[in-house]
Amino acid sequence: MSLKQFSLEGKKALVVGGRRNMGKGFALGLAEAAADVVVTDLAVEDGALQSVADEISEMGRRSAAIQADISSKQSVSELVDQTISVLGGLDVLMNVAVMYHRKALPDLDEDGWNQLTNVNLKGYWLMHQAVAPIMQAQRSGSIINLSSRGGLKAHADKGMGNYAIVKAGVAMMTRQY
């Protein structure tokens, strides 16, 4: 299928959680549709994030791999500033970052809960806070949050219940914008 009908020529995108799996796929898809794309992730040691940025560059698009901790307001601010510096603007934010602990809720400790909510909920919120004013000022832009059908109903796998809870929060936050 040709993506020409979905051309994003001239658009600038930031994919949070773009190192592998769905995030990588979305980043490459945006680039295939002619968008310039910055990818970010917390983990960069394995070289996978840079590899995604290199693939995007090989498509003739501007790209960069930027390490960021989206649970930190300062890190998010620096990420957005660097993205705008590299791309010359920002039209699309795609929040794909995810982390989960495969534990039933009664077995999840406070540190695990904090890690889960810091990435999957607080991180998305901080990204919204940093990007929404930019998009409002330019009177255009799109924020796309990856949730999960698991966030719409109770998860059959009790070890995934904690993930379902934060993804329900992401779905509701998205509806509020």
Residue spans for each PLM region:
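Canonical Rossmann dinucleotide-binding motif of NAD(H)/NADP(H)-dependent dehydrogenases/reductases
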Residues: L8-V38
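Conserved NAD(P)H cofactor-binding loop of Rossmann-fold oxidoreductase domains
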Residues: V96-H101
